[in-house]
Amino acid sequence: MFNTKIEFSKYDPELWKAIDQEKNRQENHIELIASENYTSNYVMHVQGSQLTNKYAEGYPEKRYYGGCKYVDIIEKLAINRAKKLFNADYANVQPHSGSQANFAVYTALLNPGDTILGMKLSHGGHLTHGSSVNFSGKTYNVIGYGVDKKGNIDYQEILTLAKKYKPKMIIGGFSAYSGICNWSKMRDIADEINAYFVVDIAHVAGLIAANLYPNPIDYAHVVTSTTHKTLAGPRGGLILAKNGTNTFYKKINLSVFPGAQGGPLMHVIAAKAIAFKEALEPAFKIYQKQVIKNAQVMVQSFLKKDYQIVSGNTFNHLFLLDLTSKNITGQEADIALGKCNITVNKNTIPNDLRSPFITSGIRIGTPAVTKRGFKENEMLQISDWIVHILNNIKDKNSLLGIKNEVLKLCSKYPVYI
């Protein structure tokens, strides 16, 4: 019925053109957005497979539809690999995204109006950790913690707020924090007030899988994650836990389905299974080590050039460049760098006086550039380019010259051959 040897460009040239343009953009831009990465061809291939046709509401061997024999095998592969990768004894691979994973966990453990304690978005947290524009901020009573004057998580503040407000849940994790989190200390605080401790590892899941960042699985009641970012898999979500009861795990499962979602995306779950397999291989740890090295090399380069780094260093894949003293907004930096084919995102910094649409900083991450083969020398060159652009932000000729250099570098390191 269907010819699998399709000529996409002829059938829908308008759509194909946009896809091809995006492919070229990825090849010709230096990608420094911390939450972006490049998946393998295996991951992309499986997402375009016949699995996209299959409905499989429920869980393996407990489906509401027939014909699930083979998708059961696929989902169990993904579950078992996820458990092995993160040293967990429970995994749910069905969440469509990290936000969906967080939503499912919150609704499983909380009631509307309950108090939660999460990291402020302006200090490095995530929308789903209590932002007023997100479901988490609209559904629950949110108390926010932040970082101290040195840019490190303020555990004393967490303890003080926990004792004062008695939240039902404390949320660990971040979207823009370059330090190491003390999961043990946060669990102790949660235990002191009899609260759930939930950790969102979306940004550092790949580093944790490679044993290069502390794993919260032995401390958190529940761990959530995305499967892209540092993990370099398909866009999707994941829920993990350890040392819980079957009743507890069933509660989370029911909150995912039927509580938050209907049918799982089996083509994406298969891609997750491949990504977990890739992350279990020795090459993955080598890659993650280089991700951290590349970020740290950039930090030191910026510091030597009199640029400020929030927290002063990085111990993971990202860092925040504080532009306050340079009289440049994050938005201006984002636009100027984009004109030179260097992609970052504007980002608020702790105690930022500018709006989230303007900001006083930019966030820089190294997962994608490391994936395409960049190492220390390339990162030093990129840091030099960024500084030159920001120091000469209105010099169009200078920016054009750097764009040409960026294109030359990108051509030496193709993403997809």
From Swiss-Prot:
It is found in: Cytoplasm. Homodimer. Belongs to the SHMT family. GO terms for cellular component: cytosol. It is an enzyme of class 2 (transferase). GO terms for molecular function: glycine hydroxymethyltransferase activity; pyridoxal phosphate binding. This is Serine hydroxymethyltransferase.
